[in-house]
Amino acid sequence: MRASARLNSYSHGGNMITLTINGQSRQVDTADDTPLLWVIREQLQMTGTKFGCGAGLCGACTVHLDGTAVRSCQTSAKDAAGKKITTIEGLGGGRPHALQVAWEAEQVPQCGYCQSGQIMQAASLLAKNPDPTKQEIVAHMDGNLCRCMTYGRIQRAIVRAAADMRSKSGA
């Protein structure tokens, strides 16, 4: 099923909610059960967050709610109201985030489909733990799937970004 067809299965229920996405307040009309993913992609036209499985199993749709990584396909827009939502478009605050720079340096992208979810998941790790071990990286990234199997590159990019972020913060 195409993404737009899936969104159309969620009616606009006459419920106006305010979402704070990437620092901007946005009003949307949505049914109570509409996943945040579809509001982000279809109503707000921010397509960096991807639809992967629709069941919260692959991680392609990962965004941050109040700094915590969540699967936007399993989070209703209504539940996200009143929280700070960050998508891949807002991660670097208008500039490339250290993870995005490291992703390119380590040549992580292949098909790129998992990329935004992987980066958002990794960013939540580095926000809590600026110097993770390989085991901590593997454990935190478990559940974010990459069909191109670039897991080694993903891990190296996270280590590189962490080192870059620590050097810039003086840690």
Regions found by a protein language model. Name each.
Residues R6-A171:
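Signature of N-terminal electron-transfer/Fe-S-associated modules in redox systems
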